[in-house]
Amino acid sequence: MQLDNDSEFAKKIFNPNRAFAKQARIKNMCEYKDLVHEANEDYEHFWGELAKQKLTWFKPFDKVLNSDNAPFFKWFENGKINVSYNCIDRHLKDKKNKVAIIFEGEMGDYNVITYRKLHSEVNKTANLLKNEFNVKKGDRVIIYMPMIVESVYMMLACTRIGAIHSIVFAGFSPEALRDRINDAQAKLVITADGTFRKGKPYMLKPALDKALENNACPSVEKALIVIRNAKEIDYVRGRDFVYNEMVNYQSDKCEPEMMDSEDPLFLLYTSGSTGKPKGVQHSSAGYLLWAQMTMEWVFDIRDNDNFWCTADIGWITGHTYVVYGPLACGATTLILEGTMSYPDYGRWWRMIEEYRVDKFYTSPTAIRMLHAKGENEPSKYNLESLKVLGTVGEPINPTAWKWFYEKIGNSKCSIVDTWWQTETGGHIISPLPGATPIRASCATLPLPGIHAEVLNEDGTKTKPGEQGFLCITKPWPSMVRNIWGDEKRYIDSYFSQIKLNGEYVYLSGDGAIVDENGYITIIGRTDDIVNVSGHRIGTAEVESAISKHEMVAECAVVGIPDTIKGEGLFAFVVLCDGAKCNLGESLELLKEMNHILSVEIGKIAKLDNVMYVPGLPKTRSGKIMRRLLKSIAKKESITQDLSTLEDVNVVKEIMSIVQMEE
């Protein structure tokens, strides 16, 4: 066994690139600390000034923060604003011919949308929604769409007329779609006939038909269909209408609706512990302000930058860093249809080269997969345009971080390892690329104005090196405002467990460790923490250690009941290059992985079971379905919805291995 040097690598400090830092918005740690001090000195003044300077208001707000009905906080009270106006109209004077969106379809089609073109298309779409479908301010519109430019038109058209959009990821099942439609009581559903994935048509309209059959969603009056792959689909007379046939008859002038700062902008449903999805409700002004500020601070976005976030718009990352953040800044955002692996694993690197991408934001899962499937693929492309790299969605292990830093960033790009959630609206903890010394797999410090702390259950601060609960102890503008239609669930979910100075604080649900320098490392969900003989061990920490073995391409660890220890560790391991091992080799490999764990974490962290599998079950957003793996490890029947999986055959292959081992 050749245990790599990642343990030492993880301790290494990387300072920002000097040339980049000189021109960055926040150039050094002194400037960062000045901003933090400014926010701490006068919290409301800090946020109020940012809102005045960065957003365009129809009517100024008269109160920065209203905490009278905490935790239902109100920001920028009585201000009037429109998000669509801030993302498009205000840029037209100086940037009407600037590219707003670059789109690349999976079949090789290509589209460039200027801000002037975006303005025209959004206005026509907004008029279509108003005039033909009677969509009004406050109505909910479900968007069940793939990654195409029309999806952005739909989002911004809704915001222009004051409708509340709720995007449902295009990989969700008809049942999941139905649940979200009914919870939101949506008036209109927008979808596409289909899209393209891995070179083949992938149909969406049949899922909508199934969701709506037998009047299962009585609030829905009409459905609007965008033709993308032009395959034969069934239409329901009187309900289904074709966007492409109607939109060009509409005027390209549509005055933006004056919205209150606190008017809901969108709902985005997340998984809930009860099984019922939670409709996370975000406001207009506060959300947009933080989307713009984090683009400026975390990505140091510049006028000529081409920004590429690989997330789907069905997730919060796609909302904030594909659409609203880049467009609020007047930047150019890239949209990609399809997968990273079609036609080959060089697709992303070719795009970075071809479109001269400056700032690149993706998930650790994608990085690990690209590393495993095409470790040397990036060397075939010119990636010199890159200035900042970012990761999102889960903790990134040092092995993946190192490859990303060295091979993609050429050891010159800061990696902004961002921590945030659907509920936070935007980044909460992150390095600043021109200022923050970074460490592999460390989210580093809270952003200015954000009070993130690691606390014990009794509200006391943890000591350096101790694991605790990551909390946010003061309200911030982009925070979740409510769970749609369920105030009690909002309080129970986020403001009912940990108190500081007698007041409940926002509980993120993530575990974290803070070091003596204040740097925060995310351990993972607190429900992804395994209690082994009284010792709380984060599965992400175990996965990071196992991944250091030279034969391990990827792994996922879950806790299983153990009569002696309470819980044991069960690992699903994907070997590099599809390698296989016999019984003797597998026992030796288990021994070697446990040696790494004893060195990295301690002898208490020991794998009890290992299953070598061809792949891990992942959603189309790249998230590993750990609950599913836990059911398999515990030999329970699978009850999870598999419709969101990238490849359901992976589960079948794992189950066949289980049957062989029984």
UniProtKB/Swiss-Prot annotation:
It catalyses: acetate + ATP + CoA = acetyl-CoA + AMP + diphosphate. Keywords: Acetylation, ATP-binding, Ligase, Magnesium, Metal-binding, Nucleotide-binding. CoA binds at R197, K198, G199, K200, T317, S533. ATP binds at G393, E394, P395, D417, T418, W419, W420, Q421, T422, D510, R525, R536. InterPro entries: Ac_CoA_lig, ACAS_N, AMP-bd_C, AMP-bd_C_sf, AMP-binding_CS, AMP-dep_synth/lig_dom, ANL_N_sf. Gene3D superfamilies: 3.30.300.30, N-terminal domain of ligase-like. GO terms for molecular function: acetate-CoA ligase activity; AMP binding; ATP binding; metal ion binding. GO terms for biological process: acetyl-CoA biosynthetic process from acetate. Pfam families: ACAS_N, AMP-binding, AMP-binding_C. GO terms for cellular component: cytosol. The keyword Acetylation applies. Mg(2+) binds at H549, V552. Its cofactor is Mg(2+). Catalyzes the conversion of acetate into acetyl-CoA (AcCoA), an essential intermediate at the junction of anabolic and catabolic pathways. AcsA undergoes a two-step reaction. In the first half reaction, AcsA combines acetate with ATP to form acetyl-adenylate (AcAMP) intermediate. In the second half reaction, it can then transfer the acetyl group from AcAMP to the sulfhydryl group of CoA, forming the product AcCoA. PANTHER family: ACETYL-COENZYME A SYNTHETASE, ACETYL-COENZYME A SYNTHETASE 1. This is Acetyl-coenzyme A synthetase. It comes from Helicobacter pylori (strain G27).
